[in-house]
Amino acid sequence: MDESRIETHIRPLLGARSIKGLTLWDIEGMQADIVAGRTAKPRNGRGGISTGGTGVASRAVGTLRSIMGHATRLGVIEKNPAAGVRLVASAPKTRRLSFAELRLFGQAMRAAEADAEHPVGLAAIRLALLTGFRRGEILGLQHSWVHGAEGYIAFPDTKTGPQMRAIGPKAAECIAAQPRRPGSPYVFPGDWSDGHFIGMVRVLERVCDKAGLDGVTPHVLRHTFASVAGNLNFSELTIKGLLGHAPRGVTQGYVHLDIALVVAADKVSTAISDMLDGRG
């Protein structure tokens, strides 16, 4: 990955300069150029789509800082000018993917799949976007809880107790497409244990690196689902019900699901699926 940053971002911007002549201003200028997308370009192979952004720029500065630190230890230069660089601010915690970013993210997911990225991780990420579920709810999901034809999942325990949570057909299709492992109750089983899959964050980081998207965490996927629901003009109460924040979706002691939530889950997950697949 460091080699990729060097060839894609550092060398095009600073490759003609002598290492002894580089200043803090040069490196901060490089960072600004990467943020602005000056080094953005398509590329073949596992690297996928290369763009700019604050995260890409910060990582490039970190790579250059390490290189120049090594040069300092070897006596090639007296001082590491990258050590004093002020990194650009990271994305706020309320980050969510815009419609354009969702399309770009979908492209990166397809590129990752073509590059033999972990299929369980990719499926877990897709389901998170299609449902707005928390990371723990996604990874701990068990087949016996899923009622795809009826449009809901019956969680025996969540942050607010047992819940029936609405899902759309696109989410149900994603779940149904997962191969069952004999003896495992999990929709997303672990690679080497009886537990569930745990590598979702690492897969997400690699997909985001391909897409050039910064500050994207599993919680951002949850925010994105809520944001799309808002753009489709669903009420705050309905969105809270979809996310499991409010008791609206559960009545009569965990045996009835509000039909309005099923309709909303269908529309939101279909819209997100279309954007991911390049149709929306």
What residue ranges belong to the model's regions?
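Short, polar N-cap/turn motifs at the start of nucleic acid-interacting alpha helices
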Residues: K79, S144-Y152, D214-G215, F234-G253, ...
